[in-house]
Every structure is written in C-alpha cells, then in structure tokens.
Amino acid sequence: MAASKKAVLGPLVGAVDQGTSSTRFLVFNSRTAELLSHHQVEIKQEFPREGWVEQDPKEILHSVYECIEKTCEKLGQLNIGISNIKAIGVSNQRETTVVWDKITGEPLYNAVVWLDLRTQSTVESLSKRIPGNNNFVKSKTGLPLSTYFSAVKLRWLLDNVRKVQKAVEEKRALFGTIDSWLIWSLTGGVNGGVHCTDVTNASRTMLFNIHSLEWDKQLCEFFGIPMEILPHVRSSSEIYGLMKAGALEGVPISGCLGDQSAALVGQMCFQIGQAKNTYGTGCFLLCNTGHKCVFSDHGLLTTVAYKLGRDKPVYYALEGSVAIAGAVIRWLRDNLGIIKTSEEIEKLAKEVGTSYGCYFVPAFSGLYAPYWEPSARGIICGLTQFTNKCHIAFAALEAVCFQTREILDAMNRDCGIPLSHLQVDGGMTSNKILMQLQADILYIPVVKPLMPETTALGAAMAAGAAEGVDVWSLEPEDLSAVTMERFEPQINAEESEIRYSTWKKAVMKSMGWVTTQSPEGGDPSVFCSLPLGFFIVSSMAMLIGARYISGIP
C-alpha cells in the first residue's frame, strides 16, 4: 500500500542548531511553525588537561552535513519534497573559538570551547593593565574580562600555537566563532566561502563595540588581535550565501543567531521586559531591554539580542549566564557512573523527592553570573552516611534551579520590575521534576512551550524573514500562538527561602579553591584562615562518600 501523502501548507525553512553537546538539523513549516522532521548527532568534547575543553571543528562540520542529509531522507519518507526548503538558519554555541587556514580550509587547532579555563593567567595579566576595574572592556562590550569570551581564547592561540602564528604572519588565518566556521565552510570554503558572523555572535567575542556595532580598534589593540583575521559582521537576518554541497545545494543561508539569542526569538520575546531561560549545557536567562543598552549593577552581562535585517534596529538584552546546567548530568553519567543515560536522573530524583540536606555547587569552570569568580570549584556538601546517589541526583537538579534563582534575583534588581513568570526552553525542560523544582525555588510559575525546539525555531524564523526569502512574517499578528505547559509553586515561600539561603552558604564554600586571592567582594579572612586539617578531613570524607555511593567495599 502506498504511503499517504502528507499535506505541506506553505514553504519550509531549515535550521542548523549546533550546540556544545550535539548538532541538529530541523525543518519547520513557515506558516504554522510546525516541526516536521529533524536529526541529531552527539558531539565529543575533549579534556586534554584540567580546565581545558576542546572540540574538533571538522567533526562539527561533518555532523552538520550528516544531520542535513538524514533529515532530508526522513522528509522523503514523509513524501515531503526537499525543494520546499527555501532557506536555512544557523544557531550555535557562542564564544567557542576556531582559527583556520583559508587556503587549505583546515583548522589550525581544535575549537577552544566557551567553558575552557586555560586563559585564566591571561585574564589576570590583562586585568592589571585595565584602569577602573575592567570598565574599559565592559563599557564597550557589556562583558566582564573573563575566560568565557573569545578574545582571550584567540590571544592564547596566537601565543601558544605555532601553526596559528605562522598562518597569521602569512595572511592565511581566519578567525571565527562556530557560526563563522560553518557558514564559511557551507558556502564554499576555500572556493569562495563567505567569512562572516552576525551581531549576536560578534558581541560575545570581547572585541565588538555593542554601541557602534563594529569591531573596536582599541579593543583589538589591547588584546593584540590583528583585525584582518576577523569576520565581516552582518545582521541576524539576511542572505549570507548559498549552500554549495549536499542535498540542499543552492538553498540560501539567511539567518544566524547565537543560540541564546535564537531562543529569545523562538520564544517570541520581542517586547521590552520579556525574558526566557534556556536549560542546555549551561543555563542562560535573557531579558529584552529594547534599543537601550542596560548595564547591570548585579553581575549580569549586556549583550546584543538580535538585529533582524540590515536596515532593522538592534535590540539588546541583559543576560545571566550559568556555566554548568545540563553538563552536570553528563558529568554524573560519564565521570561518576551514577547514571547510564541522562534520562535516568529524573527517575533517581523522584525516588527520594529531596536532597536530604545535600547541596551540590557544580562550579567546574568557576562561577559565572552573578559572581564571575574563576577561583571557585565544584563541591558536594552536607553529606551523611544516609546520603545515596538519589540524593546527589536530586541535589544536581536543585543546583540548576538555585543558580537560575540567583540570576533571576539579579535581573529583577537591575530591571526594577520582577518577572511574574519564567518562560523556559532547552533539552532539560523535558524533566518534570526539574521544572517543578524551578517553580518552587523561584516561587513564581514556570511556563514551557510544548514544542521545545525554540532555539532552532528562532534561527528558522530569522532565515525565513530575510529580505529576498520572505517566507516567514515576524509581524505580531502573524506569529503562531504557542501552547504552554505551566508549573505552579507547590511549597510555601518560607521553605523556598530556607533552601535558597542554605544553597548560598554552599556557594561561598566553593570559592577561593585555586588562587590565593579572595573572591571579589568576599571576606579574605574566610579563605586565608582555613587550616590544613580541614582539607585533610574533607578530602577523606569525600573519598569515603564516593566509595560508599559506588558500592566499593
């Protein structure tokens, strides 16, 4: 019996969603925003030294081609012709840094991932040269001087990798974040590939002036970055070039947004004061501040939200960034073996329904917002002989929620108007225990779209709306209504506050582990007076606890 033909109402738009943990290609109906098909490939992360995180740029590129081909095959099985795909958008992990040879097309080193900490000494050295406690950088970029952003990663490559140095000397080097590497490669690479980025990704490099929307000569001189290796900066919605290979050869790439900006667009947060929180490898809360750069007094970033067209106005956002969210689940799976699959975490947490006084601060890459404390490291505290892997699983989920509470509190103080509810998205939002915990800890409702792929949707919307494509209207009256699932707080406010205040104590204990300096704004005496015996006893306790949890006699 022949397969029934599926009706396709209107043009289709594809989206590459290249994240820290995986690559996906998804295809949407531009009239209804319905997700028709997708394919996903997990991406390896390499940890060559403590604090270092790398990925293979060629593996990332190959995963994009694989996802496109597999998705097109699935569309064929649904009797949907791929000729209906009129445009492709790109969303990507931000800050991750790639340098490649424009003559050979080969990467000159692995991609240095946003989580990577190798540049801490570079940051400390540079900070001594900045008057006014980093305000020189922050006033231009909206960002604190941190290992998180691309400029110091690029500086490290220029200082330490001979291949990169030689390519720069010979005028063969190109720099880009993951979007630039992908767009250059997909539009032809060595045969005329387009070397560009969009304003949202450029704003995460620490080299981009968010007021003039241009690469900043002063910043490039300060970091010692040759401007000729930087990509051309474009809007988030315009035709950059055409696909030059694969099943979708000839289709325009016409949308590009850093993943968190893409999620803001996909959640349709187009009004001032609208906010969303994305739960992925990290956790990122963005609030639309309109055409105005709002600078935080409470540890948040100021960043470009989007610019949806060459002649369209730029929108800005306040952002709270948490380094480790979904990554803590991966760590429990891959490093400790507490779970075999990421999905098991919900089952373990549900078994106990409490952390039983156990608190987990997953500061594997230091602490991001609102502390910006690179000296912090991960701790699990409050352990007793009763603690088991279920309690640790529950504490890991709570940690994601507590970190979100910290950045939401900071955002409420900066904006002056507390959020009445929190819109959420990302892979972790399928975990109902996590979503209920989040509502309890924030003590406001949490709402999530039933179609969770908002990051890819945002990239598709930008691509479909581009001039010359024009298959997706972003006018408010044309946007599809989003069906939401709602989680209401189920504990009283007092209990919520007690749990949160205990978490804050745990956070303070995580600081000051890897430098002799005290955490910014903290009391140095707290960290200078810890006796050696404390570290010996705590280390023994952790060892015994680990053996107990793993069942080693």
Curated annotation (Swiss-Prot):
Known pathway: Polyol metabolism; glycerol degradation via glycerol kinase pathway; sn-glycerol 3-phosphate from glycerol: step 1/1
Binding site for substrate: 20, 94, 148, 259
Residue numbers binding ATP: 24, 281, 326, 427-431
Pfam families to which the protein is assigned, alphabetical: FGGY_C, FGGY_N
Keywords assigned by UniProt, alphabetized: ATP-binding, Cytoplasm, Glycerol metabolism, Kinase, Membrane, Mitochondrion, Mitochondrion outer membrane, Nucleotide-binding, Transferase
UniProt record, GO biological process: glycerol catabolic process; glycerol metabolic process; glycerol-3-phosphate biosynthetic process; triglyceride metabolic process
Gene Ontology molecular function: ATP binding; glycerol kinase activity
Annotated compartments: Mitochondrion outer membrane; Cytoplasm
Broad EC category: transferase
Annotated catalysed reactions: glycerol + ATP = sn-glycerol 3-phosphate + ADP + H(+)
UniProt cross-references to PROSITE patterns, sorted A to Z: FGGY_KINASES_1 (PS00933), FGGY_KINASES_2 (PS00445)
Gene Ontology cellular component list: mitochondrial outer membrane; mitochondrion
Membrane topology per record: Peripheral membrane protein
E.C. no: 2.7.1.30
InterPro entries: ATPase_NBD (IPR043129), Carb_kinase_FGGY (IPR000577), Carb_kinase_FGGY_CS (IPR018483), FGGY_C (IPR018485), FGGY_N (IPR018484), GK1-3_metazoan-type (IPR042018), Glycerol_kin (IPR005999)
UniProt family annotation: Belongs to the FGGY kinase family.
Its biological purpose: May be involved in the regulation of glycerol uptake and metabolism.
Protein name: Glycerol kinase 3
Annotated source species: Homo sapiens (Human)
